[in-house]
C-alpha cells in the first residue's frame, strides 16, 4: 500500500520457510521452493477489437468478445473434465478470464509450463482458427489469446478480488464454471463486489485442498484423444 499499488499480483509459488529463506543469498535456492508453483495457470484474453497500428494496445472491452472468450474457456473446462482435473475460473478484472489448476508444489515452472503448452495445443486443435498463442499483439487480432507462458518464475496475474486500475474500478472475481454464461465482468466493481460476496459462498474457498498430482494427470493425457 505504501507504494500506491492498486492491483495485487502474487506469484504462483511461495517460500517454504520465510524466516529461513528471507535472505538474498537463499531466496532463489531450490530448498526455498520458489521454483515450485502451487498452480498451473491459463490466461485468456479476447483480441477481437484491436488496432494494428498500435502493437502495445490492449484489447478494448466488449461483451461479444468476452462471450467468445467464455466459449473457449468452457472448451478448456471440457478438457479438464475429461482428464478428471479440478479447475477454478475467475474474471481477470478487465477483458478476459484466468483459470487455475492447483497442483502439488513438487514440479518446476518448466514442467508446469510444458503441461500448459500441451493442454493449449489440444484446445487449439479443437478450436482451429479461434485461438492464438502469438506473442506479437497485432498477430492476435480476431482471436482469443491463450497465454500459457504465465507459468514462468516471476510471472504474475491479478489476484482474486484484486481491483484493476480502470475507470470503473472493476474487480477480478472467483466464479463457478456454470456462472460464466450469465455474467458481465463490468458488473463486478469495488462498489458491488463486497455486498455480492457477503451473500454467497466463495467458489475458490477450497482451492488449496485440491492440489493435484501432475504425474497422474500426465498418464491420462498420454492416452487422451483430441
Regions found by a protein language model. Name each.
Residues 77-90:
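Active-site palm subdomain of RNA-directed nucleic acid polymerases
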Residues 92-101:
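Short, conserved phosphate-binding/catalytic loop or strand-edge motifs used
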Residues 37-39, 86, 96:
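Short glycine-rich loop/turn motifs
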Residues 87-93, 134-138:
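Short beta-strand
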Residues 2-40, 46-66, 70, 75, ...:
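C-terminal accessory nucleic-acid interaction domains of nucleic acid-metabolism proteins
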Amino acid at each position: 500500500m505504501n507504494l500506491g499499488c492498486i492491483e495485487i499480483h502474487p506469484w504462483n509459488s511461495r517460500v517454504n520457510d520465510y524466516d529461513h529463506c528471507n535472505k538474498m543469498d537463499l531466496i532463489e535456492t531450490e530448498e526455498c521452493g520458489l521454483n515450485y508453483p502451487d498452480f498451473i495457470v491459463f490466461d485468456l484474453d479476447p483480441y477481437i477489437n484491436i488496432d494494428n497500428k498500435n502493437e502495445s494496445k490492449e484489447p478494448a472491452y466488449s461483451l461479444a468478445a468476452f462471450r467468445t472468450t467464455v466459449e473457449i474457456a468452457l472448451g478448456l473446462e471440457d478438457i479438464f473434465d475429461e482428464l478428471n482435473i479440478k479447475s477454478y475460473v475467475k474474471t481477470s478484472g478487465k477483458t478476459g478470464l484466468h483459470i487455475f489448476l492447483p497442483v502439488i508444489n513438487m514440479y518446476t515452472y518448466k514442467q508446469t509450463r510444458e503441461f500448459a503448452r500441451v493442454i493449449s495445443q489440444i484446445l487449439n486443435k479443437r478450436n482451429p482458427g479461434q485461438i492464438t498463442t502469438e506473442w506479437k499483439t497485432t498477430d492476435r487480432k480476431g482471436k482469443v489469446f491463450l497465454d500459457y507462458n504465465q507459468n514462468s518464475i516471476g510471472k504474475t496475474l491479478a489476484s482474486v478480488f484484486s481491483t484493476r486500475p480502470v475507470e470503473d474500478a472493476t474487480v477480478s472475481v472467483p466464479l463457478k464454471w456454470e456462472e460464466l454464461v450469465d455474467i458481465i465482468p463490468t458488473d463486478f466493481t469495488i462498489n458491488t463486489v463486497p455486498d455480492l460476496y457477503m451473500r454467497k459462498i466463495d467458489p475458490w474457498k477450497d482451492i488449496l485442498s485440491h492440489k493435484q498430482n501432475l504425474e497422474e494427470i500426465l498418464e491420462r493425457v498420454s492416452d487422451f484423444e483430441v
